[in-house]
Amino acid sequence: MNQTKYIFVTGGVTSSLGKGIIAASLAKLLQGRGYRTTIQKFDPYINVDPGTLNPYEHGECYVTDDGAETDLDLGHYERFLNVPTSQANNVTTGRVYLSVIEKERRGEFLGKTVQVVPHITNEIKDRMQLLGKSGDYDIVITEIGGTVGDIESLPYIESVRQLVWELGENNGIVIHLTLVPYLAAAGELKTKPTQHSVKTLMESGIKADILVCRTEHELSQELRQKLALFCNVKKEAVIQSIDASTIYEVPNLMLEEGLDVVALKKLDLPKKASPDLKNWNTFLKRLKSPKQTVNIGLVGKYVEMQDCYKSILEAFIHAGAANETKVNVISIHSEHINADNVEEKLGTLDGVLVAPGFGERGIEGKIEAVRYVRENNIPFFGICLGMQMSVIEYSRNILGYADANSTEMNEKTPHPVVNLMEEQKNITDKGGTMRLGAWKCDIKPNTLAHRIYGEKTISERHRHRYEYNNKYADELQKAGLKASGVNPDTGLVEIVELENHPFFIGVQYHPEYKSTVANPHPIFVNFVAAAVNAHKK
């Protein structure tokens, strides 16, 4: 293909309709037909990136290989497509404005008055085409965050309008995702919210090419005809997106509805072969027909909101399917764990994952959880802060340093077994300043980590400021907590493990970010397998 084609996905009526899942599902189908496809997300908030956002407000912050702190939708894109994303795949209003203001300060606008149109919209359009101009992709799908009609989204909607016009016929299309609610009192689906949403989009100068309708009930042919007539689309372009039991069913549902076929027709592209979803459907079959069930505790600080640990929960789905096992993830708030109730909270579980996080709140509960699973031979997996808690717990209860701590929690601790990284000590800005992105790790032979990975050197994604303090490495090693993975350049300990334990591993990095449907992460796969063994015993 000579020219990259563009698909824009907008949303109406309400937020959280699943634009990201629809975009990822369409991309999966187009990828399955042989088209090189990527997805990008444009977020209307003024933060430069979501790295400093409270997890309760935004859900997890997803990290790419190149160290970008991004929206959690990029995790969905990677999990569906099995292709890495980058900084270019996520743009925020804050980043756009920052770039334009920096250009103005450098004098790049030749003294002109800088305005939303054309300067902000031109910046948005340039970023929308950045991946397309790389030559790596046939089709670029762009998800516009927010809801049509929101004041924050207006510059993006205007940019889409201009870009579709500039690209010319068959080179750019708009998919509008909307809600068709069911009124139980009337016993029928109502199309009026969708009609008004499309009308709002048209007032901005954009005609939707395809309508994707989220619904709890089947759309009748009459209803589809009505939507087509009043929303000015062809009947074949009215796509039903009925509620599914798992997001991984959505590509098949969109295939049945013909979303990819309609999109290709609008873009004047050949259908090529039918999408190859053989491996995807094998995964789905394993997911829906498990042979056993395990209960794994997720000990964290933000467990009230599932999106805070989105990638971890999805990684358990991938690992569960790989083991033909249903993984029941039981959320346990670390603030609610203490020495008196830890057995009641964790005693019946088949495994415990101590989750990542920041700050002092709930720390003692995490440390108590690590102690209990270590002493009772329950499979343990610690990620980032969870790994650091295992080091603190071991230092306190095995080395006898009762006041061992991280300098994040206590700057004056006499035993800082977890310490601020040297390169972080003079940094004052919070945004984008952590140790971020993919870093190498050398794995020692004859260790649990080596059995899991089967490789000498791995690359994993990081997001942290604090690290294992190597001053205590010899003592911890002699006492049994092995450092089995180390960064080859800095000597930073990345993996710790216990030898005489069914499964005990802590990692400084975030393996959940690299788990996909096609490649479940090996630590999660082995952790679930260990939980299965524990359950059988």
Swiss-Prot record:
Name under which the protein is recorded: CTP synthase
Binding annotation for L-glutamine: 56, 357, 385-388, 408, 465
Residues the entry annotates as binding ATP: 16-21, 73
The UniProt record lists the keyword ATP-binding: yes
EC number: 6.3.4.2
CC annotations in GO: cytosol
Pathway entry: Pyrimidine metabolism; CTP biosynthesis via de novo pathway; CTP from UDP: step 2/2
Amino-acid positions noted as binding UTP in the UniProt annotation, renumbered to this chain: 15, 190-195, 226
Family: Belongs to the CTP synthase family.
Classification of source organism: Bacteria, Pseudomonadati, Bacteroidota, Flavobacteriia, Flavobacteriales
Alphabetical list of InterPro entries matching this protein: Class_I_gatase-like, CTP_synthase, CTP_synthase_N, GATASE, GATase1_CTP_Synthase, P-loop_NTPase
Residues binding CTP: 15, 150-152, 190-195, 226
GO biological process terms, semicolon-separated: 'de novo' CTP biosynthetic process; pyrimidine nucleobase biosynthetic process
EC class name: ligase
PANTHER family on file: CTP SYNTHASE, CTP SYNTHASE-RELATED
Domain Glutamine amidotransferase type-1: 295-537
Gene that encodes the chain: pyrG
Gene3D superfamilies reported for this sequence: 3.40.50.880, P-loop containing nucleotide triphosphate hydrolases
Record's catalysed reaction(s): UTP + L-glutamine + ATP + H2O = CTP + L-glutamate + ADP + phosphate + 2 H(+); L-glutamine + H2O = L-glutamate + NH4(+); UTP + NH4(+) + ATP = CTP + ADP + phosphate + 2 H(+)
Description of how the protein assembles with itself and partners: Homotetramer.
Extra facts: CTPSs have evolved a hybrid strategy for distinguishing between UTP and CTP. The overlapping regions of the product feedback inhibitory and substrate sites recognize a common feature in both compounds, the triphosphate moiety. To differentiate isosteric substrate and product pyrimidine rings, an additional pocket far from the expected kinase/ligase catalytic site, specifically recognizes the cytosine and ribose portions of the product inhibitor.
